[in-house]
Structure formats: structure tokens, C-alpha cells
Amino acid sequence: LSSADISRRNAAICQLSFETGLRSVDICNLRLSDVDWKHNVIHIVQSKTQRPLNLPIRSSYGNAMVDYLLKERPRCNEDYFFLSAHAPYAKLNTTWHIVRTVVFAAGVETVGRLTGTRMFRHNVASTMLRKGVPLPAISEELGHKCQDSTMVYLSTDQETMSSLTLPLPKAGDNE
């Protein structure tokens, strides 16, 4: 997928979502004032849980966000970070179509699979699990109140999940 195939806004949205697992609604609600470039952190209150979340800005999506801000974002008084591509400029209502279009253009098979930012949230959770990150930290990163919610995201990672289970004794073993 070349940079000519995707707008800077869409690239930044997908990179941010892919690496952080942020919900679509939180990306849409992200404001310029939520991004602390001096300390390289994004401060938000998650829409679904009302829990604060502080995400370190990684260079990969941070650079994509800066590229969008400097080269493509419309010059206007709107505080939302990601805006519609055409006037009147306003906050986005969803990122589903953006992510779906980019995933399709990249040739990712989506039949029978999750699409949109939920696919990226599952990927973030599974990647963290494979790296040995403890469940409470994964829950925190995804902004879940309850670790049971995180388990839904991890249940698709069968190989890693099965390595974490304790072996059960065979039936009839009295030891």
C-alpha cells in the first residue's frame, strides 16, 4: 500500500488505531488539546467507560499524526484532531469506513473476520499477550473496567492462551 493510495488523515487514524487499540469513538472524539506533544502523551477520557487513559506517543503513529496536522488537516478553529475531508469541516462520526477501506486496499482478507478498529483492538491485545504482558496491564491499555472484557479479545489467540492453561490430571488419577 503506497502513501499515494491513502490520505494522511486515514494513515494516521489507522496507525493510531492499529498500535494503540483505541476505540473508534475515542479516535473520533480526540481533540488537539488531548495531545501533549511536549511530554509525548495522549490524555483522553474514554467514551465507553469514562475512565482516563494516558497513552505514550510512539514515533510511528506520532509522526503520522504530525504529518496529517502539518500537511493535510484543514486550517480551522475546530478542536477535534481528525476532521472530515471536505467543508464544512467537522469531527468524524466513525472510523469504520476509513479502516475498512485501508484494510481492503492492503489486501487483508476480511471474510468471516472482525473488521474496523475492533480488529485492531484484538491485535493489540494478542500482541501484548504474546510478549508476556500481564492481563491487568492489557486490560488497562484497552481501557477495560473488568478483565473478563479483555478475555474476549484474547480468546482468539488460541496458541498463546493454551500455553497459559494448567494441565489437568487424567481422569482416574488419584495423585
Each PLM stretch: what is its role?
Residues 1-175:
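Conserved catalytic core of the tyrosine transesterase superfamily
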